[in-house]
Amino acid sequence: MKLPIYLDYAATTPVDPRVAEKMMQCLTMDGIFGNPASRSHRYGWQAEEAVDIARNQVAELINADPREIVFTSGATESDNLAIKGVAHFYHKKGKHIITSKTEHKAVLDTCRQLEREGYEVTYLQPEPSGLIPVSMIEAAMREDTILVSIMQVNNEIGVIQDIDAIGELCRSRKIIFHVDAAQSAGKLPIDVQTTKVDLMSISGHKMYGPKGIGALYVSRKPRIRLEAAMHGGGHERGMRSGTLATHQIVGMGEAAAIAKADMEVDNERIRRLRDKLWNGINHIEETYINGDVEKRACGSLNVSFNFVEGESLMMALKDLAVSSGSACTSASLEPSYVLRALGLNDEMAHSSIRFSIGRFTTDEEIDHAIETIKESIGNLREMSPLWEMFKDGIDLDSVQWAHH
């Protein structure tokens, strides 16, 4: 067993060896190294064919038409292209956007930028479960609403939003619907033929593909128009210029094909391991699961250990690679904005750890993780005066702390 144990699959996944092997065939002189846009010789044709195959594989993962797949540098770029692209193209129709407070920063910061440009954004507050009721979205809709952007699976707490119902509502009101599917593509069955989604962001490195590659699904029926953010050679139907990174695209395609083929088996294994981890630690006193228990992605477990400081817990869990929120915001010592939006106080938000399990996690690793967590929580609480006061029956909320 290799230490530290990797339990941060929501931050990134290792590239599947089968994917890496496919990518290696697109790099060197004796491989498919040509520019897919070179139409005058075999090297270009081979690369174009490899890209076409990968585009089909990504399309099949979500049951889309391959012409609806636009390759980008990742889900962050896809989110930017979708939200800014719609806002700028349809600005004459309206300037109101609806999203939620628990979205990824790639969506929230893009919306903040649009606010600086004169757009109006409504940020919905989810229920304590992390779920956003369709009625809440409907109540926020206005005559000038042009876009709703809601993620399918939350990156910190793993809750699954009902994008089918939200899609139906948006379609009935003729409002464009964007879904950030970075955490769900390749892990949940997605069918854009039945789910009324207009735009969907997908990430390669969240499903055992390489980093630096993603895709944006752009619906053709109804046809969604976007204003491009990257101008140049008119690649990707003019939506995203730039020479296509054949090796990364091929990697993402292969990762999508494997994810589709192995999804059921993978998910069953991962769900079993996640339940094993939770059942191993849920009897620890003052331990709470964050987010809806039922409507949750199978690899995700976000737990608050009351009276333990999150950063000190992560240092105590040095044998476990885990995080206290999303990787993109983990450098800040602020408590998770996602957990704060669920109504957790600063202390509980600070004492939370995100465990995310994936394809290469083993039973042995989960057993070791359970023992490590139990031991670390015990040690840290022994040192905590707050824990001692709590055990003595003192109501900590009513204590008047002296300010120095």
Curated annotation (Swiss-Prot):
<keyword id="KW-0408">Iron</keyword>
<dbReference type="InterPro" id="IPR020578">
    <property type="entry name" value="Aminotrans_V_PyrdxlP_BS"/>
</dbReference>
<keyword id="KW-0479">Metal-binding</keyword>
<feature type="binding site">
    <location>
        <position position="155"/>
    </location>
    <ligand>
        <name>pyridoxal 5'-phosphate</name>
    </ligand>
</feature>
<keyword id="KW-0411">Iron-sulfur</keyword>
<comment type="function">
    <text>Master enzyme that delivers sulfur to a number of partners involved in Fe-S cluster assembly, tRNA modification or cofactor biosynthesis. Catalyzes the removal of elemental sulfur atoms from cysteine to produce alanine. Functions as a sulfur delivery protein for Fe-S cluster synthesis onto IscU, an Fe-S scaffold assembly protein, as well as other S acceptor proteins.</text>
</comment>
<dbReference type="InterPro" id="IPR000192">
    <property type="entry name" value="Aminotrans_V_dom"/>
</dbReference>
<dbReference type="GO" id="GO:0051537">
    <property type="term" value="F:2 iron, 2 sulfur cluster binding"/>
</dbReference>
<feature type="binding site" description="via persulfide group">
    <location>
        <position position="328"/>
    </location>
    <ligand>
        <name>[2Fe-2S] cluster</name>
    </ligand>
</feature>
<comment type="pathway">
    <text>Cofactor biosynthesis; iron-sulfur cluster biosynthesis.</text>
</comment>
<dbReference type="InterPro" id="IPR015421">
    <property type="entry name" value="PyrdxlP-dep_Trfase_major"/>
</dbReference>
<comment type="subunit">
    <text>Homodimer. Forms a heterotetramer with IscU, interacts with other sulfur acceptors.</text>
</comment>
<feature type="binding site">
    <location>
        <begin position="203"/>
        <end position="205"/>
    </location>
    <ligand>
        <name>pyridoxal 5'-phosphate</name>
    </ligand>
</feature>
<protein>
    <recommendedName>
        <fullName>Cysteine desulfurase IscS</fullName>
        <ecNumber>2.8.1.7</ecNumber>
    </recommendedName>
</protein>
<dbReference type="GO" id="GO:0046872">
    <property type="term" value="F:metal ion binding"/>
</dbReference>
<dbReference type="InterPro" id="IPR015424">
    <property type="entry name" value="PyrdxlP-dep_Trfase"/>
</dbReference>
<dbReference type="Pfam" id="PF00266">
    <property type="entry name" value="Aminotran_5"/>
</dbReference>
<feature type="binding site">
    <location>
        <position position="243"/>
    </location>
    <ligand>
        <name>pyridoxal 5'-phosphate</name>
    </ligand>
</feature>
<dbReference type="InterPro" id="IPR010240">
    <property type="entry name" value="Cys_deSase_IscS"/>
</dbReference>
<dbReference type="InterPro" id="IPR016454">
    <property type="entry name" value="Cysteine_dSase"/>
</dbReference>
<dbReference type="GO" id="GO:1990221">
    <property type="term" value="C:L-cysteine desulfurase complex"/>
</dbReference>
<feature type="modified residue" description="N6-(pyridoxal phosphate)lysine">
    <location>
        <position position="206"/>
    </location>
</feature>
<keyword id="KW-0001">2Fe-2S</keyword>
<dbReference type="GO" id="GO:0031071">
    <property type="term" value="F:cysteine desulfurase activity"/>
</dbReference>
<dbReference type="GO" id="GO:0044571">
    <property type="term" value="P:[2Fe-2S] cluster assembly"/>
</dbReference>
<dbReference type="InterPro" id="IPR015422">
    <property type="entry name" value="PyrdxlP-dep_Trfase_small"/>
</dbReference>
<feature type="active site" description="Cysteine persulfide intermediate">
    <location>
        <position position="328"/>
    </location>
</feature>
<keyword id="KW-0663">Pyridoxal phosphate</keyword>
<feature type="binding site">
    <location>
        <begin position="75"/>
        <end position="76"/>
    </location>
    <ligand>
        <name>pyridoxal 5'-phosphate</name>
    </ligand>
</feature>
<comment type="similarity">
    <text>Belongs to the class-V pyridoxal-phosphate-dependent aminotransferase family. NifS/IscS subfamily.</text>
</comment>
<dbReference type="GO" id="GO:0030170">
    <property type="term" value="F:pyridoxal phosphate binding"/>
</dbReference>
<feature type="binding site">
    <location>
        <position position="183"/>
    </location>
    <ligand>
        <name>pyridoxal 5'-phosphate</name>
    </ligand>
</feature>
<keyword id="KW-0808">Transferase</keyword>
<keyword id="KW-0963">Cytoplasm</keyword>
